[in-house]
Amino acid sequence: MMTTLLLAVHLAGAEPPANYPTPNMLIEANDPKLKDVRVLDTRAKAKYEAGHVPGAVRADAAPWAKAVLANKADAEFWKAELAKVGVTPTKPVVVYSDDVRDSARTWWMLKLAGVPDARILNGGWKAWTAAKLPEEKAETVATAEPHNWKPDPNRLADKTHVLDQLKGGSTCVDARTKDEFTGEKAFAKKSGHIPGATHLEWVELLDPKTDKFLPPADLIKLVKDRKIDLDKPAVTYCQGGGRAAVLAFGLELAGAKSVRNYYPSWGEWGNADDTPVESKKK
């Protein structure tokens, strides 16, 4: 009870949220609405037990990621998994971690599952502790009545989709480091990038001091400077889907109408025999 009261006091002085082109994707640590959402903590169990956002449910998203990669994350899978952590279609879900790649990956999987309102806690656990907000150590257990989710296939791109998109001139955006993009560094048989891809490393979307997403004007300027057309369908990719999820989130936050995450990413593309590659090795 005391923790709840302290949390309410801290949240009472919240500042209004930033005005991004796509609203209700981010939530600040001091936002009063956090009292009325399902909060998921995707950090390691030991970190959760050491202290977490009051009322947060620990969600182990690793099995979700494996199922998505294996093409086994169907409606029945999400029906069982999301019920375990108390996710319902009527309550917003807020995800946080100590690494925005984990938060974004989980956000993206929730959207893939068909969750209508999923958001990221801006700045994650770092922002929560920086604001000196209350913490608790007691585990929160929350279950929900299993729901028949309708997964959204438009969130996911596979290799065939990307190959087809190349013919249609869609936007591919590479979230990896510059050395990975140019081919100087490789974690697959082939090095380089998908032909015609635009390079926008995932960390560029964030304030390095706070781990928060750039303010609206700065985010939009960054995207426009890279000549990314937010009205065209976009595909993001990296090595294994996590960095690409950050980029997918950032592009949608900036106003992109259609963004897919090529989840197998370079781990598949760079090892396949039928995929074209561009390289800018010196």
What residue ranges belong to the model's regions?
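Short, hinge-like loop/turn segments at secondary-structure boundaries
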Residues: E135-A138, K189-K190, P276-K280
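Phosphate-coordinating loops and pocket residues in cytosolic domains that bind phosphorylated ligands
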Residues: A50, A130, N271
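Hydrophobic h-region of N-terminal signal peptides that target proteins for export
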Residues: T3-E15
